[in-house]
Amino acid sequence: MNDTVTIRTRKFMTNRLLQRKQMVIDVLHPGKATVPKTEIREKLAKMYKTTPDVIFVFGFRTHFGGGKTTGFGMIYDSLDYAKKNEPKHRLARHGLYEKKKTSRKQRKERKNRMKKVRGTAKANVGAGKKPKE
């Protein structure tokens, strides 16, 4: 059943500066719903002989009438480069990043402390307490 889905890549570019390959991905899926990103990652991994964990796909838009979806993809040389260069929200989608959430009260107190000072001193107040040495 998955044979009806075709993945094509275009505008392929090797970005040596960021240790990745980047491309536009066209997914042809006539008469079917939009293909999940996990499935696209797995198929790209087979095409480029790598593992799905270093592949990041995003920005998919299905064309009017369905049947064709276009998006963007990047394949990193290693997971370390991916963690270094990818935005945090994309890493979070893969489960590679967890944002630390401060409590509501702490955020409000910090905001009110910052209101009391002006200029460059604001950075010192916003930094919080210094760690004990």
Swiss-Prot record:
Its main location: cytoplasm. It comes from Homo sapiens. Keywords: Acetylation, Cytoplasm, Diamond-Blackfan anemia, Isopeptide bond, Nucleus, Phosphoprotein, Ribonucleoprotein, Ribosomal protein, Ubl conjugation. Coiled coil: none annotated. One of its GO terms (molecular function) is structural constituent of ribosome. It is linked to Diamond-Blackfan anemia 3: A form of Diamond-Blackfan anemia, a congenital non-regenerative hypoplastic anemia that usually presents early in infancy. Diamond-Blackfan anemia is characterized by a moderate to severe macrocytic anemia, erythroblastopenia, and an increased risk of developing leukemia. 30 to 40% of Diamond-Blackfan anemia patients present with short stature and congenital anomalies, the most frequent being craniofacial (Pierre-Robin syndrome and cleft palate), thumb and urogenital anomalies. Mature tissues, such as adult brain, skeletal muscle, heart, and kidney, express low levels, whereas tissues and organs with significant populations of proliferating cells, such as fetal brain, placenta, bone marrow, and various glandular organs, contain significantly higher levels. The modification N-acetylmethionine is found at residue 1. Component of the small ribosomal subunit. The ribosome is a large ribonucleoprotein complex responsible for the synthesis of proteins in the cell. Required for processing of pre-rRNA and maturation of 40S ribosomal subunits. Part of the small subunit (SSU) processome, first precursor of the small eukaryotic ribosomal subunit. GO terms for cellular component: cytoplasm; cytosol; cytosolic ribosome; cytosolic small ribosomal subunit; endoplasmic reticulum; membrane; nucleolus; nucleoplasm. This is Small ribosomal subunit protein eS24. The keyword Ubl conjugation applies. GO terms for biological process: cytoplasmic translation; erythrocyte homeostasis; ribosomal small subunit biogenesis; rRNA processing; translation. HAMAP family: Ribosomal_eS24. PANTHER family: 40S RIBOSOMAL PROTEIN S24. Residues 101-119 have a biased composition (Basic residues).
